[in-house]
Amino acid sequence: MRLLGRKSMLLVRTTLRPSEVHGLGLFADEFIPKGFVIWRFDGHVDCRYDESQLAALPEEDQEQLRTFCYLNPGTRLYVYCGDNARYMNHSEQPNTENVGFDEGLFEGEGITIAARDIQPGEEILCDYRSFDADARDGEI
């Protein structure tokens, strides 16, 4: 298992595979115990955009970013996950929990932890509404 002190967004080994939920999904390559931090914001890997920065981009780039970004409910900035965390699919019964996004407790963002033990080969799922203001407005 990777050490928590390491600079990264995803703190567990994962792989991308076709998902029964939607398109590609993020799957655990190792056992992840309940409570383990799976993801955290890293300003060296992730990018933040405000609405005017997105609007200034070509339409194709805007579409790509709006697909993969989440809108932080506290800062109202769009966050693009620079690694495969952006392939976490939505579930109303996720195996992860998102902590601190409304308060911006971790570098202005939150963290994602395992809500229960996650087995190798299991898809890592999150509830977009717990950290994405657009999803709270019904845009999932």
Regions found by a protein language model. Name each.
Residues 33-34, 38, 46-48:
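Catalytic strand-loop segment that frames the active site of acyl-thioester-processing enzymes
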Residues 18-27:
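Short aromatic-glycine motifs in intrinsically disordered, low-complexity regions
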Residues 2-19, 60-134:
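Catalytic core of the SET domain in histone-lysine N-methyltransferases
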Residues 42-43, 77:
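Intrinsically disordered, low-complexity proline/glycine-rich segments
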Residues 25, 31, 116-119:
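Residue-level "contact hotspot" at macromolecular interaction interfaces
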Residues 46-62, 135-140:
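Short, compositionally biased
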